């Protein structure tokens, strides 16, 4: 009987289960959406039990639809929406509050207080992160502050904290193990990425009891086996875990220092492998742990772009300029250029390297000759300009010049965008055959732990190129276009 690896990809809007074979090819996939809760403006929450239910449902679906028996699963790898925070009762397994999602801004007030007390440099130095509502630490504090008796119960060891990987491993193992991996721990604002331990000083500042924190383990290791009653009577090794963006870096086989990937989803997340050194950023990048494997930890620099694919959705749903996302490519290619039009899609502010949450979207360079095609092209080009902004500071911080960019995510199907991206960066852009790189990364991490794959070299050799986009633009034009973009961003930031 053939053996397969099962990846659980627990995302922000849906949970997916994907079966991979030995060649790293997708055998079958199942997906289930779950409810988003918005109790107040800017707040985003999930029901952790509903997430768990959705994971069980997709596991059942993928096995039955693919006609794969549970005993044919060699191991399970988990990848997850990062930073999203769950606090639950150790005895009952019941969450004491909804999961607070990474996007949620409900702890912005706590962050402002911490920054006002001058704690930002301390957190930055120890965790590689900024004090921001994005990360888990202030979310745990919020739950402990707002649920009656929670802090006292946490101190007595009655409550457990976890990011979604921890919650799912705990549930799948029947409550036997309370663990996270290095990559997820590095997103909590409580983990020292240099000593590789929960940091007592930071926990003290946040008022989070150490007793509730999971044990931090490598990203590729057998943590536990599934409780038979959760996996059709079978005990399967749960053998790998990583946050979604780090898993994508692994799935793209970016194993050597200086290799980078960009995921074009709702937003963009760009990660560059910096090897065994944690590179401190001077330009608003995050320093994060890529993974812990083979007895060592490797680091990455990360840049975040808030609006990417959602700008294409805006053209479709908000402005009704296109009927499908694919139409954007057709219209963009009908014109030679944007005719001087720039769209700055700062709908919710700008991320790396600007970190300005007040700035709003703007359009510049409109004339009587501007058409729908120019506007659509300018919107697509904005994704590439924002990517160049991030890569420019990555190169400056790391001292590494990028030689190629590997890409994944929904928007990479757009050939116009990929060619323009290559032109603007002056490096080749590589699109892989398997676009589900996040799930593939989780499968690879678990597969290495159970011997399904032998080494990272085997995995790197499996990485298959679907199409390579080579730069065709001359330097003068590239400089002129990018200078125009920088001018547009400055103008947008001045208008508040």
UniProtKB/Swiss-Prot annotation:
<comment type="similarity">
    <text>Belongs to the FGGY kinase family.</text>
</comment>
<keyword id="KW-0319">Glycerol metabolism</keyword>
<feature type="binding site">
    <location>
        <position position="309"/>
    </location>
    <ligand>
        <name>ADP</name>
    </ligand>
</feature>
<feature type="binding site">
    <location>
        <position position="414"/>
    </location>
    <ligand>
        <name>ADP</name>
    </ligand>
</feature>
<feature type="binding site">
    <location>
        <position position="245"/>
    </location>
    <ligand>
        <name>glycerol</name>
    </ligand>
</feature>
<dbReference type="Pfam" id="PF02782">
    <property type="entry name" value="FGGY_C"/>
</dbReference>
<feature type="binding site">
    <location>
        <position position="82"/>
    </location>
    <ligand>
        <name>glycerol</name>
    </ligand>
</feature>
<feature type="binding site">
    <location>
        <position position="12"/>
    </location>
    <ligand>
        <name>ATP</name>
    </ligand>
</feature>
<dbReference type="GO" id="GO:0005524">
    <property type="term" value="F:ATP binding"/>
</dbReference>
<feature type="binding site">
    <location>
        <position position="410"/>
    </location>
    <ligand>
        <name>ADP</name>
    </ligand>
</feature>
<feature type="binding site">
    <location>
        <position position="410"/>
    </location>
    <ligand>
        <name>ATP</name>
    </ligand>
</feature>
<feature type="binding site">
    <location>
        <position position="244"/>
    </location>
    <ligand>
        <name>sn-glycerol 3-phosphate</name>
    </ligand>
</feature>
<dbReference type="InterPro" id="IPR018484">
    <property type="entry name" value="FGGY_N"/>
</dbReference>
<keyword id="KW-0418">Kinase</keyword>
<dbReference type="InterPro" id="IPR043129">
    <property type="entry name" value="ATPase_NBD"/>
</dbReference>
<dbReference type="GO" id="GO:0004370">
    <property type="term" value="F:glycerol kinase activity"/>
</dbReference>
<feature type="binding site">
    <location>
        <position position="134"/>
    </location>
    <ligand>
        <name>glycerol</name>
    </ligand>
</feature>
<dbReference type="GO" id="GO:0019563">
    <property type="term" value="P:glycerol catabolic process"/>
</dbReference>
<dbReference type="InterPro" id="IPR018485">
    <property type="entry name" value="FGGY_C"/>
</dbReference>
<feature type="binding site">
    <location>
        <position position="83"/>
    </location>
    <ligand>
        <name>glycerol</name>
    </ligand>
</feature>
<dbReference type="InterPro" id="IPR018483">
    <property type="entry name" value="Carb_kinase_FGGY_CS"/>
</dbReference>
<feature type="binding site">
    <location>
        <position position="266"/>
    </location>
    <ligand>
        <name>ATP</name>
    </ligand>
</feature>
<feature type="binding site">
    <location>
        <position position="134"/>
    </location>
    <ligand>
        <name>sn-glycerol 3-phosphate</name>
    </ligand>
</feature>
<feature type="binding site">
    <location>
        <position position="266"/>
    </location>
    <ligand>
        <name>ADP</name>
    </ligand>
</feature>
<dbReference type="GO" id="GO:0006072">
    <property type="term" value="P:glycerol-3-phosphate metabolic process"/>
</dbReference>
<feature type="binding site">
    <location>
        <position position="14"/>
    </location>
    <ligand>
        <name>ATP</name>
    </ligand>
</feature>
<feature type="modified residue" description="Phosphohistidine; by HPr">
    <location>
        <position position="230"/>
    </location>
</feature>
<dbReference type="GO" id="GO:0005829">
    <property type="term" value="C:cytosol"/>
</dbReference>
<feature type="binding site">
    <location>
        <position position="244"/>
    </location>
    <ligand>
        <name>glycerol</name>
    </ligand>
</feature>
<comment type="function">
    <text>Key enzyme in the regulation of glycerol uptake and metabolism. Catalyzes the phosphorylation of glycerol to yield sn-glycerol 3-phosphate.</text>
</comment>
<dbReference type="InterPro" id="IPR005999">
    <property type="entry name" value="Glycerol_kin"/>
</dbReference>
<dbReference type="Pfam" id="PF00370">
    <property type="entry name" value="FGGY_N"/>
</dbReference>
<dbReference type="InterPro" id="IPR000577">
    <property type="entry name" value="Carb_kinase_FGGY"/>
</dbReference>
<dbReference type="GO" id="GO:0006071">
    <property type="term" value="P:glycerol metabolic process"/>
</dbReference>
<feature type="binding site">
    <location>
        <position position="12"/>
    </location>
    <ligand>
        <name>ADP</name>
    </ligand>
</feature>
<feature type="binding site">
    <location>
        <position position="83"/>
    </location>
    <ligand>
        <name>sn-glycerol 3-phosphate</name>
    </ligand>
</feature>
<feature type="binding site">
    <location>
        <position position="12"/>
    </location>
    <ligand>
        <name>sn-glycerol 3-phosphate</name>
    </ligand>
</feature>
<comment type="pathway">
    <text>Polyol metabolism; glycerol degradation via glycerol kinase pathway; sn-glycerol 3-phosphate from glycerol: step 1/1.</text>
</comment>
<feature type="binding site">
    <location>
        <position position="82"/>
    </location>
    <ligand>
        <name>sn-glycerol 3-phosphate</name>
    </ligand>
</feature>
<keyword id="KW-0597">Phosphoprotein</keyword>
<keyword id="KW-0067">ATP-binding</keyword>
<protein>
    <recommendedName>
        <fullName>Glycerol kinase</fullName>
        <ecNumber>2.7.1.30</ecNumber>
    </recommendedName>
</protein>
